[in-house]
Amino acid sequence: MSEYRSPKYGKGRKRKRKQSSSSPIVIGLVLVMAVLVLFSLGLRLLLNSGGSAPAVEMETPETAAAAETAPAETVKEKGPSLWQRLFGSKETEPPEMPEPEHVVSTASIAVTGDVLMHMPVINTGLRSDGSYNFDSIFQYLNTYASAADLAVANLETTLAGSDKGYKYSGHPAFNCPDEIVDALKNAGFDLLLTANNHCYDTSEYGFLRTVTTVRSKGLQVLGTRAEVSEPKYAVQEVNGIKIGMVNYTYQGLPENPTAGKVYMNRNTLSDTCALLVNSFVPGQLDSFYQEVNQCLTEMKANGAEATVMFIHWGNEYQTTPSTEQQQIAQQLCDMGFDVIVGGHPHVIQSAALLTSRVDPDRKTVCLYSTGNAVSNQRIAEMDLKTGHTEDGLLFSMTFSKYSDGTVYLEEVDLLPCWVDLRTEPQTQYPIIPLDDSIRDQWQSLFGLTDEALEGAQKSYDRTLELTGSGIRQAREYLAQQKQQREADYLAAVTETQEAA
């Protein structure tokens, strides 16, 4: 509101106006003439536009009855006012303002650890007719895995079958019945990682059959492939967001470095399979970085809007990532990966928020190891008596696409899990999701004994001790970035409105 100001007058005395008795009469005549002119113009405009004044009609009983039974007239759109038709003025409509940028779609990915099928675990699936069913392993996890748009697990076994001279076996050469894939699919998993140190445990036959079997059951494979012509990576559209993913594993150190062979779990890969697995030699990383960078370039050329690296690395049973793991993670961050998810140590390792040395404004979330999803690595069976080999998790990441087309990593989260071992009424290895929001129901929902409940609680604490700080830092950073984006979008819209 403008400040009220009193009228200003010139200096000196006010000039006295000459009085005239005829002035009011003249002014009145002028006003009457102006009104008549305006009325005449308005009437002419109405007639020209087809309008006419309605005639006044006395209401009779007949006309009243007709009015009650007559159909209602369609209400016509209101035209311009008389003032607008007389003087041509238009009501100024506000300019159309752009909507603030907002999320138009999200894509969530959930990742669990090593599906490590030791023989005691395999035996729990055997049925009286000779078939296998492993659904009991995932009976409690399926609700959480199926809630993700894309669920991923590391298949740390081969699928060579039992009709070509191979027997089902656990450590050290894993070969599991095909039904493990059915169980994973039934639990909501969509993609299996197969680049790991056990992918050649049943030689070339088992290597290739694993790929074809997983695909034949409707799941995807990443890390190994059946043909050299297939890409080493995948670009998958999830809810309108294209996510580029790649899976690599470390190689065993060569017995003869000059032979040019690839080694996995003390096995020498055939020349064919050596070209069908994504792998790197620890300590010889330059060629690995070049290859990964090429994958990253191709993924983006194929439309990838977000990128994830799944990597099999590190030292078994070590809860702290090695120096080499950290060096590789930093290099992958510098390349531009959004998320890094590791496996192989069979224990959970820490999470970290990494800062790119190329672009300090760019961050990467890294979970160094997801631990075991399922295994028989019980405290009683292990030299490591801490219980960490019984611990697993479901790590989730959510990408969001905004209305301007940009995609961001919006959130990460972690669900601790624990593998229970039951012997009654039959032996089972169910994965227990340790959802803190229902902690008071763990025992009743999952059928835990008092001893098992204590084991679950200890597992939860171990996992949070290892990952809590890094996950919390990542979550806080991502939340701040989202808040800043929303503030920037709002400021841009406000500026546009003010300019208009």
Model-inferred region functions:
Residues S2-K11, S23-A64, E68-A500:
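Acidic, metal/ion-coordinating pockets
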